[in-house]
Amino acid sequence: DKVLYVNSPRFTNLDEPSTQRFAFVERLRAATSELDVRDAGDLLDPMRMVADDFAMKNLLAAIEVTGAGLMEGMKVARPELTTRQVMETVDYVFRLRGADLGFHTGVSLASDLDEELQWETTAEEEAARKGDARIGEGMLVHFDAGAQMNHYSADIQRTVPAGPRFTDEQRRVYEGVLAVQKAVIGAVRPGVTWQELHQIAVSMLSDLGGWDESYTYGIGHFIGLEVHEHGDYVGPLQPGMVLAIEQGAVVNGTRVAFEDDVLVTESGHEWLTRFIPIEIDDVEALRREEPLVRLEMLLRGR
């Protein structure tokens, strides 16, 4: 018999019907009876879904560097600068620490949005990430970044105020979305499925007043040799898997989103990115710290 293994990407929106996801494979099977078309994921996924010691060492290093870069960017972001200048600050720290970019660092305005933040194509998303918007007074700034160490990438998001403190409305949205993030991370353990985690987020965002309407993507993905790692997104989680848990909402033009890297352990989980400020008091305290990258250097390039 002739066997054809097809490596069909598994990273997709969890709400998308599986019949659409694997339509290509079904067409191959219908085209000829001479081929036994099988999913290459059955062979490859177990090798990549569970991190060995080498993978964990490099993922932890990537997370540490990403945290350092993000915290510097979170300190720097303010009305005197543009999103590109803040982005370059994050990337500078990555390179200073010997890391590559797992993907193009995204720094964008998260206030006064008139539509959901989503793109039809990868090219559109990359173009948006490379934008250069002026940060305004009272705005929120959103970060999405991941350093890469020895081909292993982190993937982390944070949202911060451009000023010293969140406004009351920003605080309201932030606290709501943060509660969802904590609940989903708290539910991570062996035996739970991605779909169950996704439904926790959708249900809680809906209960907040229909906030789930702007949540147009899945709850997360594996990380490893690829930022959006291949794997089994249907079966139960296993110890040793490293996940990126992400969700957020756009409420009256204000966007808050988080993404955290989480290790599935034998007894539950370990929140690997917890050291990066996420509580409101911690974020505001970080905003009061002096950045290592001097603002004069950035302002000179305006």
Pin down the residues of each PLM region.
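Active-site neighborhoods and metal-handling regions in enzymes and metal-associated proteins
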Residues: 1-302
